[in-house]
Amino acid sequence: MSDYSTGGPPPGPPPPAGGGGGAGGAGGGPPPGPPGAGDRGGGGPGGGGPGGGSAGGPSQPPGGGGPGIRKDAFADAVQRARQIAAKIGGDAATTVNNSTPDFGFGGQKRQLEDGDQPESKKLASQGDSISSQLGPIHPPPRTSMTEEYRVPDGMVGLIIGRGGEQINKIQQDSGCKVQISPDSGGLPERSVSLTGAPESVQKAKMMLDDIVSRGRGGPPGQFHDNANGGQNGTVQEIMIPAGKAGLVIGKGGETIKQLQERAGVKMILIQDGSQNTNVDKPLRIIGDPYKVQQACEMVMDILRERDQGGFGDRNEYGSRIGGGIDVPVPRHSVGVVIGRSGEMIKKIQNDAGVRIQFKQDDGTGPEKIAHIMGPPDRCEHAARIINDLLQSLRSGPPGPPGGPGMPPGGRGRGRGQGNWGPPGGEMTFSIPTHKCGLVIGRGGENVKAINQQTGAFVEISRQLPPNGDPNFKLFIIRGSPQQIDHAKQLIEEKIEGPLCPVGPGPGGPGPAGPMGPFNPGPFNQGPPGAPPHAGGPPPHQYPPQGWGNTYPQWQPPAPHDPSKAAAAAADPNAAWAAYYSHYYQQPPGPVPGPAPAPAAPPAQGEPPQPPPTGQSDYTKAWEEYYKKIGQQPQQPGAPPQQDYTKAWEEYYKKQAQVATGGGPGAPPGSQPDYSAAWAEYYRQQAAYYGQTPGPGGPQPPPTQQGQQQAQ
């Protein structure tokens, strides 16, 4: 009994395991003593008793830890398991929480239900359990970064794309947020903000480089060095002196636009509003190295020209606009300046080193403006070439009309004193009235297109046809022979038929033949008298007149009579007689009518001969006219005109000898033979136009043969 009283209460029945454990703990509470004392008090083995030996006795050393120490060790083990599960990121934490530990009592849930721990420790344990279960659902956030990237300012639109589709694609494919700065601030590059994971930012940069490289025409992936400090794209700044920034910019920015277009670079004049106007301003030039250098030289040329005092002034060639020169060119001479297939204007541009463009207009004015762009000295050189070319067109070969050349002032009718306009300055053609609309077009668009395409000037004449036929209208084409031929071809394509020449021949004025002015033959412009190339009076006979006053000598005759035409076809001689009687019934005025081969005064000792076919003798009238012309005062500054009076007298004498058959033995009423004269005329026509009449071409029309050919 003393043993029980000393070591603790007597052992209870076996079922209460908890009580036995507590007794054992009480017996082993004091520090372990000598082995004898321990045996006597039953602290280690005896304290366990039959109730607690299976749970606590064997797991603890004699006299060692109780239930509090075991619970702390279990909590530490659970905490370590949770940390391992969190690192693995799997379901290990859940497995650890639901598993039963290898201890002698219940699992974790059983532990929390024990009432031996304070309330705060229970709540902390529950929170740790919930966090371990929610950990796999919310993984830890990845590291994010923001980087500033730069792209060319001109490529921003390409990067954004239509409706922002390109920049959206970059963000979706790379997983990076892309934000572009709204303004470059006058710099050649725009800032782009890239936000995301490092690998996403790197991928977005590669995609931006590819887009910019494709925009510049290079292979993808080669822009990074260019846009961010590379050497393939050059940026150079030159200082513009104070007060000369306006020269570089030009009116409305025209000069700097032309410089950028010609050099193929981008120019930005940096102007700070806070700076003083007397401070030099930097001009930033961006582009390829060679183009940048060329642009710098062009800018310096403009500044140097101003220093020399010549920039912006007007000279004899036209007005300077934005570093260029405007040169007026007569509309009918535009084709000559351009040349066939543009050969002439290309040659001028290559020789002078400039660029020439004709400004668009409505096509109604007498001149077109050729705008020359380039350095000032080269522009002047090109303008000088164009003016020399126009001057050569205005001047014709000198010489009396009886010579082999054309009269001075060009073929046909010229303007003013006959020395204006290129050779072959004007031709008149008849077109059926119902086809005039095809030539003119709606609102005049067709005739304007012909004028612009050929360089000729086509207009409808206000004069009536020579025979007053209302079924035809007269059209006038002015320009060089090449321009006239080109315009004729286009008009013939529109009316689907040939044009009928009307009026004076290429060398002198003369109405159409008696078979009608609308015969579709190429050489029916004049009467079969003297050769047309020498039949007209000298060029200075024409007073100044406008384009509209083309045929002032014509009077509207009676309407066309078919019966008279049939009679004329039956008797050609009678038709020619009627033709001359109608044509020469008008009194000679200030603008004399055409002169057929009038009979010369009879030689000394011979009786006067009547003119053949009823023609009048106008020799004296012509002599008197030329005397009056010679007495008229010349305009100041005009070159002295030669006196062709004697030449014309000699010419008409020779024509009179030809008209009388070559000698006094010829019968007075015989028809003259103009075969040789017509042959010479056609030869000169072929030489002028660069064509050679073939075997079936026009033949000299002597008397009857000429009339049959005209039919």
UniProtKB/Swiss-Prot annotation:
Biological process terms in GO annotation: 3'-UTR-mediated mRNA destabilization; cellular response to cytokine stimulus; miRNA metabolic process; mRNA processing; mRNA transport; negative regulation of low-density lipoprotein particle clearance; negative regulation of nitric oxide biosynthetic process; positive regulation of mRNA catabolic process
Compositional bias annotation for Basic and acidic residues: 110-122
Gene Ontology cellular component list: cytoplasm; cytosol; membrane; nucleoplasm; nucleus
Keywords, ordered alphabetically: Acetylation, Cytoplasm, DNA-binding, Isopeptide bond, Methylation, mRNA processing, mRNA splicing, mRNA transport, Nucleus, Phosphoprotein, Repeat, RNA-binding, Transcription, Transcription regulation, Transport, Ubl conjugation
Modified residues (N-acetylserine): S2
Compositional bias annotation for Pro residues: 8-17, 397-407, 501-520, 528-542, 587-613
KH domain location: 144-208, 233-299, 322-386, 424-491
Subcellular location: Nucleus; Cytoplasm
InterPro entries: FUBP_C, KH-I_FUBP2_rpt1, KH-I_FUBP2_rpt2, KH-I_FUBP2_rpt3, KH-I_FUBP2_rpt4, KH_dom, KH_dom_type_1, KH_dom_type_1_sf
Complex and partners: Part of a ternary complex containing FUBP2, PTBP1, PTBP2 and HNRPH1. Interacts with PARN. Interacts with PQBP1.
Family: Belongs to the KHSRP family.
Name this polypeptide is given: Far upstream element-binding protein 2
Lineage: Eukaryota, Metazoa, Chordata, Craniata, Vertebrata
Gene: KHSRP
